[in-house]
């Protein structure tokens, strides 16, 4: 039956299987590295092409790039406030990487590329990527608070009353968990649902679900960047 369905090989779902590289004695998750490098390369090439011939009156790729930059600046200013300027590169990198990663899961035919074990997919459909992004964000807001207030930053754990110390500490540790699992769960679920639908019904039928996945991927990148900005702004303001 599988041999009669030409789409089966493309949409087969392999969960829990991984392809590893051995580098300097350490096993690294090759699938995530390959797809992440693809996303990074796409962003670098896109930015280079759009900005290689800057004009006083922007047009084409430069116009789009400036629109994205303005959007990220507004996002950072809304969440962080008057100190947002130096955090624009970080929030912009987060947003663009997650956005392109999410969309690559639906638009790039990763499953046509065969690996010895496992399969390729969106980088954000792997928990290793989302946890890394969440830990980077945790490091960023701790850095923001410590550079502005020194060790006095930790006094926030005693507010409004020292009784809440354990809960306040737990809150900071749950932030990266919620960030990583929310993004991972949404992207992985979308990929699995689309793959199963394609294996069961003709290719045209799952298109609405794929479009919904693109919309959800864009929303998830916005949510992640917005929450990252909110956490950094909270660390700077102290409330």
Curated annotation (Swiss-Prot):
Its membrane topology: Multi-pass membrane protein
Subcellular location: Plastid, Chloroplast thylakoid membrane
Chain ranges passing through the membrane: 30-50, 88-108, 127-147, 192-212, 213-233
PROSITE patterns the UniProt entry points to: ATPASE_A
Pfam family, one: ATP-synt_A
Alphabetized InterPro entries for the sequence: ATP_syn_F0_a_bact/chloroplast, ATP_synth_F0_asu, ATP_synth_F0_asu_AS, F0_ATP_A_sf
GO cellular component: chloroplast thylakoid membrane; plasma membrane; proton-transporting ATP synthase complex
GO molecular function: proton-transporting ATP synthase activity, rotational mechanism
UniProt keywords, alphabetically: ATP synthesis, CF(0), Chloroplast, Hydrogen ion transport, Ion transport, Membrane, Plastid, Thylakoid, Transmembrane, Transmembrane helix, Transport
Subunit and partners: F-type ATPases have 2 components, CF(1) - the catalytic core - and CF(0) - the membrane proton channel. CF(1) has five subunits: alpha(3), beta(3), gamma(1), delta(1), epsilon(1). CF(0) has four main subunits: a, b, b' and c.
Family: Belongs to the ATPase A chain family.
Protein task: Key component of the proton channel; it plays a direct role in the translocation of protons across the membrane.
NCBIfam families: ATP_synt_6_or_A (TIGR01131)
Protein name (record): ATP synthase subunit a, chloroplastic
Species this chain originates from: Nephroselmis olivacea
